[in-house]
């Protein structure tokens, strides 16, 4: 018996190499084999042309397509279908009429949308881009139907509403707390007496309201006076509409432009012209050195800010000295704190529990 013409390794020597050199360029083409026709089963109207299904040309407008769809839908609707004499097209039986109706509906859904129709026309003109047509078809079908912009807008509005009520709740808690502080409560009570508000509340409630109701009304009067006389700053300040997320996004371009203008003025006035810092600029530098937010810095007492200005903490060297003093003062407080002493004693004698894997 003679030896085979080619061994499993594509032949030996020069013959095998020649076969490999001839087949290698053809491998990509073999991997990309695709149907030659433009109409593909499973895409749009399948192997039927959507334009032919509706009986319209490719240049037909939306009105003509809609009119053709209504005529065919009435004709092939399963509930209204009646076979016509000599009807040789699809839909000669109720079952085939239902299939024809679904095909007509698919053709109309494909051609009524401009983007889908554009993809379909491109598929008819470029049948060779087989995998690209699959991608565009299923990417549109699987894309979310809800507009992402609507989802973002609703989410931002929901967060803004939550912010407003949360801040308002914090503000009311701060007012309720200040109403229990003797210093502010006495002052508010004196103002209420001077304005005759407490007397009016008692007269108004006489013979009509219980003592508890009168007490609640007086409490509300005191809280209203505190609201009008005390400017709460920081995290418990009165909520402002412009601080909500929705308005922050709307005003973001304005804030960005304002910051750029402010920064350019700062560079021009203080870095180029060498002007002396004003009180506002000094407090800004101090706040940045302390790494505090604007709301945190605004919540500080006025006498603290005056101390910062007197010690000229906007100068880096002075701030470093002040920072060192604060650290030393904190160490002294901790050294004299009984709880801190107990903690250090416990750490020295017992220390934290240890895990060990040594057998006893």
Swiss-Prot record:
Residues 49-124 form the J domain. One of its GO terms (biological process) is protein folding. It is a multi-pass membrane protein. Pfam families: DnaJ (PF00226). The chain crosses the membrane at residues 20-40, 150-170, 244-264. PROSITE patterns: DNAJ_2 (PS50076). Keywords: Chaperone, Membrane, Transmembrane, Transmembrane helix. InterPro entries: DnaJ_domain, DNAJC25-like, J_dom_sf. The keyword Cytoplasm does not apply. It is found in: Membrane. GO terms for cellular component: endoplasmic reticulum membrane. The keyword Transmembrane helix applies. Belongs to the DNAJC25 family. This is DnaJ homolog subfamily C member 25. It comes from Homo sapiens (Human). The lineage of its organism: Eukaryota, Metazoa, Chordata, Craniata, Vertebrata.
């Amino acid at each position: 018996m003679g030896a085979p013409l080619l061994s499993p390794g594509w032949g030996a020597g020069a013959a095998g190499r020649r076969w490999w050199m001839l087949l290698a360029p053809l491998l990509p083409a073999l991997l990309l084999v695709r149907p030659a026709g433009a109409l593909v089963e499973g895409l749009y109207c399948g192997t039927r042309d959507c334009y032919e299904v509706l009986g319209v040309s490719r240049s037909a407008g939306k009105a003509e397509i809609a009119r053709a769809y209504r005529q065919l839908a009435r004709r092939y609707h399963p509930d209204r279908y009646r076979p016509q004499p000599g009807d040789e097209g699809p839909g000669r039986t109720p079952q085939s009429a239902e299939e024809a109706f679904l095909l007509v509906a698919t053709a109309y859904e494909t051609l009524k949308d401009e983007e889908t129709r554009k993809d379909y026309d491109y598929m008819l003109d470029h049948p060779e881009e087989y995998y690209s047509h699959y991608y565009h078809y299923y990417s549109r079908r699987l894309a979310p139907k809800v507009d992402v912009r609507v989802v973002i807008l609703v989410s931002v509005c929901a967060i803004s509403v939550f912010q407003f009520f949360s801040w308002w709740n914090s503000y009311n808690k701060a007012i309720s707390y200040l109403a229990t502080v003797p210093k502010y409560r006495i002052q508010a009570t004196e103002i209420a007496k001077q304005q005759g508000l407490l007397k009016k509340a008692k007269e108004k409630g006489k013979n009509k309201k219980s003592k508890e109701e009168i007490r609640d009304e007086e409490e509300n009067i005191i809280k209203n006076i505190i609201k009008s006389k005390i400017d709460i700053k920081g995290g418990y300040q009165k909520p402002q509409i412009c601080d909500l997320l929705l308005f922050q996004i709307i005003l973001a371009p304005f804030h960005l432009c304002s910051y750029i203008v402010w920064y350019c003025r700062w560079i021009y006035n203080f870095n180029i012209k060498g002007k002396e810092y004003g009180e506002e600029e000094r407090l800004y530098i101090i706040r940045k050195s302390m790494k505090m937010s604007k709301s945190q810095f605004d919540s500080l007492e006025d006498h603290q800010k005056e101390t910062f200005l007197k010690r000229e903490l906007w100068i880096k060297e002075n701030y470093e000295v002040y920072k060192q003093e604060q650290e030393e003062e904190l160490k002294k407080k901790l050294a004299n704190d009984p709880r801190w002493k107990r903690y250090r004693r416990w750490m020295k004698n017992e220390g934290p529990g240890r895990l060990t894997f040594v057998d006893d």
